[in-house]
């Protein structure tokens, strides 16, 4: 079995990149059946990092592979929402398979401050165990410790210990937040060495084979991808600081790990790993239902590095469609009865420099005065505490924490001056205090109609959230203009460009329908749980079951 898996991996990863042809179109579906007639044997949950609803819809007419299958044969919710304010990778992934918003998962951001942490670095990473000696937010031991609720896989395993729960991803936080604390296997791309897991977890024979295949792929240069016809109009240079973006093809030298990671090659490797894991572990081939979650991280790396509207992002989506098609075809060939859900952890926003070229002259980069060091100096001066550390934050938006060394009187002055200064700043939409957010009821109703403070409440976890929450205005990119640019674009805002994501369900033979009204990613868990007849108490989650049966039947009946 392992030799067969290894051969398949090498075939998938060693083909000349520019010569790969699109996956064949899926065979015509048989007569429609109810998606809920019998429980599927395998749940395949896919997150495409930074796959915004805008990016999904922009190229929808060009899909020929896996995305075409999902959009033409499945249940399509093009207006899904990561409904909270802090639209970052870790909080977003924490919602997908828990049915819970960050206010319940405890994952309020990628990083937050714990000023009582027993180490010098008070900035905590969402997927670390900060109690480990010598750890920091940059050099950490990965852990699901901070996730406060079970995932779908965890609930399935609690109901039936025979259930296999596997999670693979490009990023550790994607694999960990979707897999949960009790997953059987959790793997992520840890660097040039390949896929890794938690400290002390040795590679299985399969993972060793996967990493050998990865090493062989990495050792080959990539001459670049051909430019699809739909990408030709995107092919023009855009200057952002010292960076020029917009015309890339993902060419890289042999051994260039960074180039591999920021390209469609990464997702192709992760999907090859997932397919090999399904075959090797015989997922979906036993009496119980198994689950595999797959975090495809390349779209996010591409979006940050090049923006969302150049050739780079266009090629990335085209390749994603092709690779997903090949992955689904492999599962079909193996005769597995599987259900797919595909969504994203958040959306994204293109770089202001290209927006200004394309009818949006008001697009801006954030004022350097709002960056952490500058903001602390300003507030300290205004509060009569020049040179003192008065606030902690890690960006020009998001949570702000008061220093623990302030007296009550100093803290009051700092809050007064911070609110006065920030609320008067032309790039700031609003600033909420912790008390204001805490007093707001947990939101309900259509996510597209929520107010900003309701979005903030969905991101709020009292023991982790800051004393203030700073939200920038729309069309203000939270990366300042600099002579030397790292990332040129990002996400994380409370606006719909970052909140809206597609949510797509598919199972062989189901009747296609599309529902354009807003739903939430927290609705995914109860919807899948209903298909496998897994009871989930409604008071333990924030989502609702989505009926995936077109017409009068109801896949949520009995939930």
From Swiss-Prot:
Name of the molecule in the record: Alkaline phosphatase PhoK
Signal peptide bounds: 1-19
PANTHER family tied to this protein: BIS(5'-ADENOSYL)-TRIPHOSPHATASE, ECTONUCLEOTIDE PYROPHOSPHATASE/PHOSPHODIESTERASE
Listed cofactors: Zn(2+)
Listed EC numbers: 3.1.3.1
Cofactor binding, note field: Binds 2 Zn(2+) ions.
Disulfide bridge partners, by residue number: 90-126, 231-314, 545-556
GO molecular-function terms, A-Z: alkaline phosphatase activity; metal ion binding; zinc ion binding
SUPFAM superfamilies assigned to the protein according to its UniProt record, in alphabetical order: Alkaline phosphatase-like
Functional pH dependence: Optimum pH is 9.0.
Catalytic activity: a phosphate monoester + H2O = an alcohol + phosphate
């Amino acid at each position: 079995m392992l030799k067969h898996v290894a051969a398949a991996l090498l075939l998938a990863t060693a083909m000349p990149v520019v010569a790969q042809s699109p996956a064949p179109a899926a065979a015509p579906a048989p007569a429609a059946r109810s998606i809920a007639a019998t429980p599927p044997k395998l749940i395949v949950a896919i997150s495409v990092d930074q796959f915004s609803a805008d990016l999904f819809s922009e190229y929808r007419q060009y899909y020929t592979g896996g995305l075409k299958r999902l959009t033409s044969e499945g249940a399509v919710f093009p207006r899904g929402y990561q409904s909270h304010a802090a639209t970052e990778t870790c909080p977003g992934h924490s919602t997908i398979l828990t049915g819970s918003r960050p206010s319940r998962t405890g994952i309020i951001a990628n990083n937050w401050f714990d000023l009582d942490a027993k180490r010098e670095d008070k900035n905590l990473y969402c997927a670390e165990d900060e109690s480990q000696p010598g750890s920091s937010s940059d050099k950490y031991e990965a852990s699901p410790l901070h996730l406060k609720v079970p995932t779908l896989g965890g609930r399935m395993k609690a109901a039936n210990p025979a259930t296999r729960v596997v999670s693979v991803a490009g990023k550790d936080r994607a694999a960990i937040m979707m897999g949960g604390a009790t997953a059987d296997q959790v793997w992520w791309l840890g660097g040039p060495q390949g896929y890794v897991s938690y400290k002390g977890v040795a590679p299985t024979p399969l993972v060793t084979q996967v990493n050998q295949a990865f090493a062989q792929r990495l050792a080959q240069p990539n001459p670049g991808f051909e430019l699809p016809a739909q990408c030709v109009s995107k092919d023009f240079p855009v200057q952002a600081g010292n960076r020029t973006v917009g015309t890339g093809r993902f060419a890289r030298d042999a051994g260039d790990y960074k180039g591999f990671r920021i390209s469609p090659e990464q997702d192709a490797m992760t999907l090859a790993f997932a397919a090999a894991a399904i075959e090797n572990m015989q997922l979906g081939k036993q009496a119980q239902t198994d689950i595999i979650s797959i975090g495809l991280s390349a779209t996010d790396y591409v979006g940050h590095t090049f923006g969302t509207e150049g050739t780079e992002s266009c090629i990335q989506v085209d390749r994603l469609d092709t690779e997903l098609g090949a992955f689904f075809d492999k599962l079909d060939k193996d005769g597995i009865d599987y259900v797919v859900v595909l969504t994203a952890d958040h959306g994204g926003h293109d770089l202001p420099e290209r927006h200004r070229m394309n009818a949006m002259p008001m697009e801006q980069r954030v004022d350097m005065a709002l960056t952490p060091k500058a903001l602390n100096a300003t507030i300290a001066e205004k509060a009569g505490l020049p040179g003192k550390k008065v606030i902690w934050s890690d960006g020009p938006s998001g949570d702000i924490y008061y220093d623990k060394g302030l007296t009550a009187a100093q803290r009051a002055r700092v809050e007064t001056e911070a609110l006065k200064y920030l609320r008067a700043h032309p790039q700031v939409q609003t600033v909420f205090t912790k008390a204001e957010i805490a007093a707001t009821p947990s939101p309900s109703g259509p996510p597209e109609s929520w107010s900003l403070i309701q979005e903030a409440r969905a991101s709020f976890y009292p023991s982790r959230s800051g004393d203030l929450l700073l939200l920038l205005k729309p069309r203000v990119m939270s990366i300042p203009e600099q002579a030397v640019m790292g990332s040129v674009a990002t996400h994380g805002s409370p606006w719909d460009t970052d909140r809206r994501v597609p949510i797509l369900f598919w199972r062989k033979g189901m009747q296609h329908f599309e529902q354009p009204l807003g739903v939430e990613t927290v609705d995914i868990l109860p919807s899948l749980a209903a298909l496998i007849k897994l009871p989930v108490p409604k008071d333990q989650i924030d989502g609702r079951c989505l009926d995936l049966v077109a017409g009068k039947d109801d896949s949520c009946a009995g939930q």
